[in-house]
Structure formats: C-alpha cells, structure tokens
Amino acid sequence: MLDVNFFDELRIGLASAEDIRNWSYGEVKKPETINYRTLKPEKDGLFCEKIFGPTRDWECYCGKYKRVRFKGIICERCGVEVTRAKVRRERMGHIELAAPVTHIWYFKGVPSRLGYLLDLAPKDLEKIIYFAAYVIVGVDEELRHNELSTLEAEMQVEKKTVADQRDADLEARAQKLEADIAELEAEGAKSDVRRKVKDGGEREMRQLRDRAQRELDRLDEIWTTFTKLSVKQLIVDELLYRELVDRYGEYFTGAMGAESIQKLMESFDIDAEAENLRETIRSGKGQKKLRALKRLKVVAAFQANQNSPMGMVLNAVPVIPPELRPMVQLDGGRFATSDLNDLYRRVINRNNRLKRLIDLGAPEIIVNNEKRMLQESVDALFDNGRRGRPVTGPGNRPLKSLSDLLKGKQGRFRQNLLGKRVDYSGRSVIVVGPQLKLHQCGLPKLMALELFKPFVMKRLVDLNHAQNIKSAKRMVERQRAQVWDVLEEVIAEHPVLLNRAPTLHRLGIQAFEPQLVEGKAIQLHPLVCEAFNADFDGDQMAVHLPLSAEAQAEARILMLSSNNILSPASGRPLAMPRLDMVTGLYHLTRLDEGATGELAASTNEESEQGVYSSPAEAQMAVDRGALVVQAKIKVRLTQQRPPRDIEAELFPEGWNYGDGWTAETTLGRVLFNELLPADYPFVNEQMPKKRQATIINDLAERYPMIVVAQTVDKLKDAGFYWATRSGVTVSISDVLVPPEKAQIMESFEAQADQIEKKYQRGALNKTERNSALVKIWSEATDEVGKAMEAHFPDDNPIPMIVKSGAAGNMTQVRSLAGMKGLVTNPKGEFIPRPIKSSFKEGLTVLEYFINTHGARKGLADTALRTADSGYLTRRLVDVSQDVIVREVDCGTERGIVTTIAEKQADGSMIRDAHVETSTYARTLAADAVDENGNVIVERGHDLGDPAIDALLEAGITQVKVRSVLTCTTGTGVCATCYGRSMATGKLVDIGEAVGIVAAQSIGEPGTQLTMRTFHQGGVAGDDITGGLPRVQELFEARVPKGKAPIADVSGRVQLEDGDRFYKITIVPDDGGEEVVYDKLSKRQRLRVFKHDDGTERLLADGDHVEVGQQLMEGAADPHEVLRVMGPRQVQIHLVNEVQEVYRSQGVSIHDKHIEVIVRQMLRRVTIIDSGATEFLPGSLTERADFEAANRRVVAEGGEPAAGRPVLMGITKASLATDSWLSAASFQETTRVLTDAAINCRSDKLIGLKENVIIGKLIPAGTGINRYRNIQVQPTEEARAAAYAVPSYDDQYYSPDGFGRNTGAAVPLDDYGFSNDYR
C-alpha cells in the first residue's frame, strides 16, 4: 500500500485503454455474480475469484490449497492466487468493449470538451455518438480533384439518361392520351367523360415530370455534396449517405458512433490546431475570438501535458474491486446488491450481444442499434441520468452510478474522506457539574472503563493482577474490584476531548481532565456551556480519547478548557459567570440602605456602629446575626489592593501586601474582592454582568491564563452559593401590572380615535393612517414600560434578574407586566392595532391570533436560518482553508489606516465605538506620533488595551496598522500582518490556521442574524436586504438588490428631477467628460450628505461629490467600487458592510477575520493581454503566479502580461482553487474532476482539505514542516550529565536533597516558592 508520507503531490489525468488493461487483473466476460446454490462467485463473472482474489484468506476457489503456507501460489486447477481476501478491495478488472464508446463526462459536461476539441456543436456530436448521423472522417482530396472532370462527365451522362427517359415517357403518354380522346370522340362520349380522361392523362404526365425532376435534384444534391465533402461534415440523410458510398466510396470514408470520433481524434493535429487558434485570437474579433479562446483552453491543455485525447473514447471499461460494490445475502435467501453491479451487468450483457451480432455478420442497422445501447449503458454506469432518462432499479429509483458515489454530502469525498467515524469515542447526555474545576469534566465510570479498556488491561498485566491480556480482558468485562483502582490510576492526567454538535467554532471541542462519576451522564463545567452553546435540557455530548503522547500533549496545551477562556472571534472572555452566577454575585455586591448593622455615626446613647477592624470580624458579626452582607460598613483591609486613586493618595510609593487602609463598602463587596487576585485594585460597586465582564477582560489582559481560570472558578462557586441565598424565584405574583396603565391607555386611545376619524373623513390615506397609528402606539408602549419599571420595588426578583444581566430584558418583562405593544405581520410590517393586554392580564382572542402570526414567522425563520448559516460557514471554510500563518514578518511597509477616536469641536476626544474590533490586537505599521512629533508607540508594537489608552491620552485619532489585506506573503499570511491571536492574546503562532478560525468566527454567529428584509417605516417597495442574506450577498460578491450608483469622478452634481426617475450628471473637476446616471428610480431615496458646515441634508443640485461616494440610498455594487476605487477600497468596503450587519445584531467579530476572507476573494487577476507570458487572454490566474511570471518575462526582456484584479464570490473562489481535491470535495464534483483530468492537474497538497482527504497530517499547527522536522540535540554539558557515574558522596543517593527522610510533609515555604498568585 502507498504510504501517504512519501509523496507530496497527486496528479489526475485521462486513462488510456492501455492504462486500464494494466490496472486490471483479468477480463470480466460474464454478467453472472454469485451462484445462488453454492454462494460462490461465478468464474469470469463480476465477482470472479480468479480476477479479484480469493473470498477467504489463504484459500483458493476449489479448495486444493488452504493455509498460509501456500502463500503466493496460483492454483493450477481454478487459477486463483492464494492470498489475503482483502485484495478484493484493491484489485480491478476490465471489460473489453466490442465497439468503442465515448466517456459521457467529456461529451456531455458543460462545456463539452469533446465538442471544443473537434470543433463540433454538442447537438451534432450527440447525433454522431448515438447513431443518428454519419460523419465524414476522411476525404481523399487529391484523388477527387484529379478525377473530378471524369466524374462530372459521368454525372452529366446519367442526368442526360434520366432526362431522355423522361422525355420518351412523356412522349409515349401524350400519344396514348391523344389516341384515347380520339377513340372517345369516335364513340360520341359525353364531354365530361372526355374531360376526365384528359385530366387523368395530364395528371400522370405531371407525375412523370415530378418524378424525373426529383431524380435530377437527387443527382444534383449527391454531386454538390460530393464536390463539397469535407472532414467533420455531418450527413443526417441515410439514403444520401448510401448513394454517396455506392458512387464515390473510394474517395472518402464516413462512420457513425464513437468509432468515428476515435478516427477523427487519430487524425487530429493538436499543435497545428493550437497555432491556428492563437492566430485567430491575435487577429479575430467578437464571437469568433471568444470561441477560439474557449477552444484554446481545451486544446492547450492537451498540448501542454502528455494526456492523449484518445482517453475520451474508451475501448475498455475498468471494473472496480468487488468489495467496493458488495453483494450480501439477506434472511430469506434474497440478495441485496450495490447498484453498480446492475449497471455493470447491463454493460456486459450488451457487449456480449454485440460481439455475437458482429460474429454472425448481422445487418448494419441491428449492429448500430446494439452499439448505441452499449454506449447508453456505459453512460449510465459513469453518470446515470446525465443524458436522457436515468436507468431505474426496482421501485422506479434511479440507480447510483460511479459519479453519484463521489457527489454530494453522502458521496465518497464528504462522507468517507472528510468526515470519518472514530474509535475510542462515546456519547451521553450531559448534566451540570458545579463542583468541578474549569479544566475537569465528570466521566461515567462505565464509559471511562470502555474508553480506557486497552490501557486498563495493560496496567492489570503490569501489576500482575492478570497473567495475560486475555484474562485482563475478562477481568475488565466482569468489572472486578481491582479494575476500578487501576482505572483511577490510568485516567489520571489523561485528557479527553468533549464535543457538542453542531461544532460551529473551534471551542465546540475542548479538552478536560476526566473525573470518575457514578451514573451514566457526563458532567460538564457550567462555565464552558457558553462556548459549547450547551444547556442541560437533554443535550448530548461526545467524548474522544487522544491516544498518542503527542496528541495528549496537544490536547493539554492547546485545547484544555482553561486555556480557551477567550473567544477566537473577538478576543473577549467566553468562560464567565452567567445566569444564576450573575444573579448571585449581583446580590452579593448589592448595597441596601437601612440594612441590619449598617454604618452609623456615634450618638450620645450609642457608640459608632458598623466599623470593623478586619473582614473576619465583620464575618463574625454576620454569623451572630448582627450584620447582613449588603449593609454599608467601614472596614480595615490589608490583603486587598486599594483602588488606583486611593493608592496614589495613601501609598505614593505603591501598595505592598499587608499595608492597611479603610474602605466604606459592604461585606459582600469585600468577599467579592477576595475572589480576585490580591494585587487587583479593590472594586467598590455593584456587579451586574457587564461589570463582571470588564473585570474578567481586564484580568485576561494583565494576568496569566491560569490566574484567570482560577478566578472565574472562584466566581462560579461564589455565584452559585449566593444565588442560593438570595432566594430569587419567579412567581406569577411577582409580575406587577402598573396601576397607571389604564390612564395611559385612555389618553392614547383618544389620540388613535382622532386619527381614525381623520381617515374616515378622507383627510389621511391608508399608509399615513398606519404610520400615524404605529407612532402613537409605540409611544404608548414606551410609556407603559416606563411606568412598569418605576412601579417595581427594588427587591422584586423579576427586575433583579434583568438588571443583573442574568437573563431577559425589559421588553420581555413589559410583555409580562405592561403591554405587548405592536407586532409585525409576516411581511415584517407593523400591524397598526397593538396588543394592549399583558400576559398577566391575559390576551383577547384577536390579540392572541395576531401575536401568533409573528411568533410562527419567527420559528420558520429560525429553521431556515440554521441551514443557510451552516452552508455559509461551509463556503467560508472552503475559501479560506489554506490561509495559514507561514512566516513571522513579510516585511511590508504597507497597512491600512484605522480611526481610534474623533476630535470634537471643543477639543475633547470621543473614543471610536469600534476600536475593539478594528484597531485592537493589531501591529502598528508606522510610528504613532502626537502633534509635537513625539513617538508614543513605535512601529511593530502590538496594540493591546494599554497601548490604545496611551494613544488616546496623547490625542492621536488615527493610526496605520498592519493588515492581512496588505500582507505580501505568497500563500497564507505572516504573523505580524495578522497581529495577535484573539484566543491567546499573544502574537499568532506560525502554523495557526487563521483562515479556518476566521470562517468559524463569521459563520458561528450566523444563526443569530435575522433573515428578514426590513421595511422602511412601513413602506412597501424596495427593501433593504439585511441580516444573513446581506452577508451572503457580500461574500458572494453579487450585485445587490436595489444597488446604488457611486460617483465615477469627483465633481459637481446636476440633478434633474423627472416624474418617475432622477437623472444625475457629474461635471468632473478636472474638466473631463461628463458622467451621466440615467433612469434612477424614485423608489430609492437620494443619499444624505454631510456638508462642510456640519449640517446633513439630501444630495441636491450643485453639491460637490468625491470619487466613489454613493449618490442614492441602498447598497453599492462591490464590482463598481473595485472598478472606480481599486482593490484596496473594495476590500475595506466589504469589511465595513459585513460588520454593519453583525454590529446591528450586537455580535462582536474582529475585522481581521473578515479581512482574511475578503483577501481570498481578490486573489485572482483576469488576463487582458498575455504579452510574452504563457497566460491565455481572459483566463483567471493567481496574483502571485501572475506577478512571478511578469518578473521572469521582464528579466528576459519580454513584454509583461496586463491583467486587472477581479472580485470573486466565495463559492467561485473555492472552485477556482489550485487544488483539485479541495475543489472536488466542495461542490460540482464531476465538473471539477473532468476539468482537472483534461488539464492533467497536479495537487501540491498545500491546503488542509487535500491532506485530510489523503490522510496526511494537516500542514497547520504542529503538522507544519518546520515543527515536524525538529530534532533535539543535547549540549555538551547535558551529554556529560547524562553519562556521569554518580559517586556515593555527592548526595546522589542520599535523600537530604529535598526534605527530611522521615516521611513527614515537606514545608514548601522553606524552598522559596513564589507566593504572587496564592
């Protein structure tokens, strides 16, 4: 078997008949499969053992040789080789065809490769192949030319004979007529009888004339056809062809069927044809040139590589190994068989019948019919249903052909090569494991035992609990007591992988250390639920076991959940308290006025209350019942760092652990701060979710991951503890309807009535009335909402849950306690009747129905969205899968400019809202300099939160940062241009598959994006596409619906306002030609512009526009932006437009991910003029190849090629990849393979998919060559130490090195272990 590590490219080409015969182990001659009585394969049949190998290991067919000792012998009785049965998976046979057939892929594919090569229209080609027309294969021009005059004379003689014969016949008939009429006259017949006779005679003469004329025309046709006869000419009329053959058979040869195609190919001169086509392209115009270009692609492909076009016509058909098309016996003696066997049987039957007919010398028409049937059966075998009706099996189901085995989700590529089932895995329901640490999961004992079975068995043998593996296996199966102890030992520090489907991003698989638990459910840490998107309502998860030491190390270092706290999409923590935990911490840090034991100044009667010397003392007061944790107290703290301002005031030198200071706070907040690292400044405020997030964010920026992991774990424990004690529950009695509601409703009812009356009077039309009502009821809903919020008391659990940020929002509470408000119909328009009741009061029947309208739409939407979003992710992964970080720095000076703040008129700075997703986590491309010329942050520095703060303080508004859009690395990107990895907060590693991370980051929130197209204020008509469809439209580079024109030049606008259309003319500043935009529909509004004086208004006559500015509302066409503004601008345009959609849904994704995808969309150049290069004009080529070829040509002193960048949609870009394996496994498998085979494509195995398909390690992460080829070489000292012979006095053997040898615990503090992070 071929070892995948010993080849580094894979080529596909056309197989010739010779190749097919060389692969084959014998010819399949009979359609028989298995003898139903003996259940043994028939000789020479589709399962023949002589051809494909024995069905049983080391046993021949007749049983003469059994046992392995006869290995390699070929039995002389039955001819079967004695070998393993698994050769039946790899040995092929073949069928020798009695007549050649064409390969349907090359004839019927679009475009038809055979048609392009032979310059025949596909319709004509079909007529030839399926025996509907003859084609002229060769003409002996010379002989015809020499003998033309003789032949012409012969033809004239023949025509004269026909004419003479006609004249003689007519003469005779005319005489007979005269005689007849004379006779009738003599008899005195009536005139009508005479007329009848006369008419009859004339009719016969007319027929004679016509018959002769037809004969003459026929001769003319034969003669003109013959004189103009040329190769590749079709003759559909069979009689004409027969005549030609009879008369002039020696001057030409003609044929039909695939044989004729084969003959045409034999005489086809590829080099001459290619030269002709190149000449046509140089001199031709229009359609002719286009056709020549298309044909040259195919012709040049055959010219460039050693493929012979003869491979498109087959003389032999390969038969795939029988194990790949098995036949199994069912209960009841029937057989279930693969469809391929049926298709092969049809081919063999027809082939054998054709052989017999040829041997019998059957008439041509019968033989041709049989040949046509053979051609059709081979077509069905290769690609059933491609031409005509598909061949069906029992129950009218189309049979699955060889092409169908490759195609689609169930095909070979996607089902078996890219997605495999793995052993050492299991799945079970998940339950919550609040007692676990962040890096642990609970694994059911039985599951663990089954997963770790081989390890347990080995260990049992090592420990002498079992004599051999067999008895160890028996012990494990009987679950003896020792087994559990060994299992505990084996699983220690052996991480397992947990995965929850759908795995939308890389955090859908994480590694945990297993803890054995009773029961059958996997226990999951509550903080990782967000990353897995898991909940405990019956979700299931799969467990996988990394086996090798390397796999375990990678799982532990890269995938352990405590190393995956940050989201790869935005770089913000994902593992943070949510739901109950948030409520608990919110409750803990609350400050209640007037609570038991709160701080009170001393009075005459009482001393000062609520002052404590330490948190411990305050805790005692709580235990005594004299204080509650929410009460305000004054307490002296020594183990917590004071906030920045207090630290600066009290400890100018800086605070040290143990320095005391007093704080006015609550005990709850002190307890909360004890959960944070000791040197984190004290946080003295209430903790809703947002605030908790900022703290964890901050920790992630400033502390090692391990500290963050420990902290979130502590927060989780405290959160659950205090959530329990907060007593937050939700009951219907907690839902309080505000008493002011009735009054509010009344006033708004009155306003609505007014509108209604105006409408009745005809003062408003329907649209105006609807928008007025929508406005009124939106206000009413807001009013009720405000009244409801004000009416809820502080200790009510419902607003507490919402305010803490644990779950829900005020809109949902408003539906419960206020009023539901306006709802939409399925079109997305507001229904002007609101739902006035709240859920607590109960809805009326009508309200219930209009409410279900929107709800049902929502559910349907969600279902569609999930599928769409999954498909988007798949396309994104495919287009970006080979973007891998290849080097540290490509050394480019280029970058993009991002805004970090805006200066206001009063000189103050407003931080840009999108710094987090645009500038953060990048590398500076140029020094950031303030107004005085001081360098604040130098070039090449990483922009984290501290650096950005420094820039803002210095008053810098824009910085130039490195970006993957400007990276000059050939394949992939460089680490400096990419910036830091969002998931680790450090510069991205070489080998990181940033393309796939980008695709997952964009695809994972896809399901949250809406489907709907939004209506502008209830106006039907041109909708603005939003949500997921808009993202797809952008990534597929489609022309948007309702596209807006952009200014081709800078200049003054002249606006003409027609009755249905606008007409905009731009007069360029440089005095060039005017640009006119005509027929701009009034349904689209004019664009709002910011003017120099700071005001905003619609575009008007006389305004000045800059090049590339949009003139109307709507979306600009990216192809236009590319044409007018160039590639850099279109990239930035696409990134911003995609971000628009995600931001509108509150999803935070870093720009760099979108940039990675957009970079892939602009990888190609279309060739305009090929210069001295090999490129064909009009072809697409990689930018890197284009530039390399031009450099080479210029160095040789030639003319470089000219090209222009093209923007390709992600689907098209994926299919246009250099790797045919990757493209074939994506979409349109047969088309990709057809194309690759003709071009003899070679796959260099650079991307990830190709390597997964052939089973190599992917060239990313630790699979990249620079990591695979590392060898460890010890230094001299290490060598000396390794081979040193210890003596007795150097303490090597004495235990004093570490601790006393008394067996007591070792006091670690004596050894100076750091206590920074205790």
From Swiss-Prot:
GO terms for biological process: DNA-templated transcription. Belongs to the RNA polymerase beta' chain family. It is an enzyme of class 2 (transferase). The RNAP catalytic core consists of 2 alpha, 1 beta, 1 beta' and 1 omega subunit. When a sigma factor is associated with the core the holoenzyme is formed, which can initiate transcription. Keywords: DNA-directed RNA polymerase, Magnesium, Metal-binding, Nucleotidyltransferase, Transcription, Transferase, Zinc. Binds 1 Mg(2+) ion per subunit. Binds 2 Zn(2+) ions per subunit. DNA-dependent RNA polymerase catalyzes the transcription of DNA into RNA using the four ribonucleoside triphosphates as substrates. Zn(2+) 1 binds at C60, C62, C75, C78. Its cofactor is Mg(2+); Zn(2+). Its EC number is 2.7.7.6. It comes from Rhodococcus opacus (strain B4). InterPro entries: DNA-dir_RpoC_beta_prime (IPR045867), DNA-dir_RpoC_beta_prime_bact (IPR012754), RNA_pol_asu (IPR000722), RNA_pol_N (IPR006592), RNA_pol_Rpb1_1 (IPR007080), RNA_pol_Rpb1_3 (IPR007066), RNA_pol_Rpb1_3_sf (IPR042102), RNA_pol_Rpb1_4 (IPR007083). This is DNA-directed RNA polymerase subunit beta'. One of its GO terms (cellular component) is DNA-directed RNA polymerase complex. PANTHER family: DNA-DIRECTED RNA POLYMERASE (PTHR19376), DNA-DIRECTED RNA POLYMERASE SUBUNIT BETA (PTHR19376:SF54). SMART domains: RPOLA_N. GO terms for molecular function: DNA binding; DNA-directed RNA polymerase activity; magnesium ion binding; zinc ion binding. Zn(2+) 2 binds at C890, C967, C974, C977.
